[in-house]
Structures are given as C-alpha cells and as structure tokens.
Amino acid sequence: MILKLFVLGLYFSILLGIGYFASRKVSNISDYYVGGKKLGFWIAALSARSTGESGWLLIGVTGMGALLGVSAFWIVIGEVLGVWISWQFMAKKFKRMTDEYDSITIPDYLVSHFGSTTNLLRIVSATALSLFVIIYVSAQIDITGKTFESFLGLNYYTGIGLGFGIVILYIFSGGFLAVAWSDFFQGSLMFVGLLLLPVVAFFTISGSESVISGLNEIDPGLLNPWGAGGLTLMNLMSVLGLLSIGIGFMGSPQVYV
C-alpha cells in the first residue's frame, strides 16, 4: 500500500508540475485554448490518442476482450481505420481552413466560414459539442472512481473527487498546453504498458499454446473471429457495429482545430 501511495503521489506531482510549467508558456487566449497551434508532432499525436482512448481502451476494450475473445479485435480495426481517415484526409485540411479564419474553436470556424451574423450557429454547435463531450468525460470520471476503488480500496466518490480535482488544477493553470503535455506523459505510460503487458503475460502463462488451449477450455467461441456460434446474421451485424466505432473518431474536435 505504501508503494502504491508513493507511485500515485509521484504521478500527481508530475501532473501538477506540468500544469505549472505550462502556465509559464501561456501569454494569450490562443495559447490557453489551443496551445498557440504549435504543438509538436509527437505531443499532438499522443495527446489526441490518449484523449480518444484513455479509460475506453485500457478498461473498456480490455474487459470487452475478456468477454468476447478474438472477435473483440473488430473494434480495434474499426478504430484504427477511423483514426487513420481522420488524420489522413480531414485533420490537415480542416486545420488549414481554421488558420485562414484564425479560429480557436470549431464554433468559431463555423461562424466565420458561413458568415453567420447571429449567435444561433454558435449556440447550436457549442451545445452539440458540449453535450457529447460531457457524456464522454462522464465516462472517464466513472473510470477514475472505479480505478481508485480497485487499486487503493478508496471510496468510489472519493476517487472521483481526487482524480478530477487534480485534472481541474492543471487545466486551470496551464490550459490546453497543460492538457497536451500531460496527455503526452500519460499516453507514453499507456503505450509502454500496453506493449509490456502481453509480453509479460505470454511468458507468465508459458507460451501461446497455453493461452489458446485455456481459452478453448473456457469457451471455444472465444477463439472464433465471428464470435460464439460462428458466421451468423446476428454476429455479422455485431461485427459491422464494432467496425463502425471508427466513425466517431472522424468527429473528434480535439484533432481538427
């Protein structure tokens, strides 16, 4: 328990330190909201992906893999395709257009591009973004509480307050720069952890044959790429649904401005 608390304290200290140093780089509203649009390649990449994945990937998809087996990989394929399309065909073009209007947010761009003279377009677009972002952030807050509960045995709501409080502190102090730099730090940890976990599991379980035979004993359907029951209409519809997760990544506001 002492080691866990030490690691957690070190982790939070790094996040608060990032917020402090980011605050020293903020000199105008563009710096605060979009980092002056001058993030480096790796920071932008890891920030976007750690925002897009985070608890959804580390907790949600891994749990889904445990329940569905090999067929859960369809959601990974859909995500990779969606992310690739958004970066390859949409993000660069959209950023060029927002730079032309000197837009900081997507509502700013829409108002400038369509020459809106009222606040209706801004209100509608901001409301839509706020609604879906709040839903997504709520899921991350829920994951934070559950992680503290299982990791340290803390009360669920105490974990939410602690984790969310740290996030609010470094966001208020350093704005988007603090978010991007902290995402880079946390994304690097996620990347290394996801690379090491299967390697450690492979050698701990004594090879791939043991994994396959173990899954087969639990449920042969876990090894079927179409899911339990094979290629049926229901499973085909499920696969199409899992692949369609990539559509959501084409509308990620943090990627485009």
Task: Specify the residue positions occupied by each region the protein language model found.
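Hydrophobic, small-residue-rich membrane helices and short re-entrant helix-turn-helix hairpins
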Residues: 102-107, 111-116, 175-185, 251-257
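Helix-loop-helix module between adjacent transmembrane segments
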Residues: 74-171, 240-248
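Helix-loop junctions at the membrane interface of multi-pass solute transporters
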Residues: 31-36, 49, 63-64, 91-99, ...
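Transmembrane helix-loop boundary segments of multi-pass membrane transporters
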Residues: 2-4, 62-76, 141-157, 177-186
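Extracellular loop-to-transmembrane helix junctions
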Residues: 2-23, 35, 39, 64-104, ...
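Membrane-interface "cap" regions at the ends of multi-pass membrane proteins
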Residues: 1-59, 171-174, 196-199
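Loop-to-helix junctions at membrane interfaces in multi-pass transport proteins
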Residues: 34-39, 43, 60-77, 111, ...
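Hydrophobic alpha-helical segments and their helix-loop junctions in multi-pass secondary transporters
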Residues: 18, 22-25, 87, 91, ...
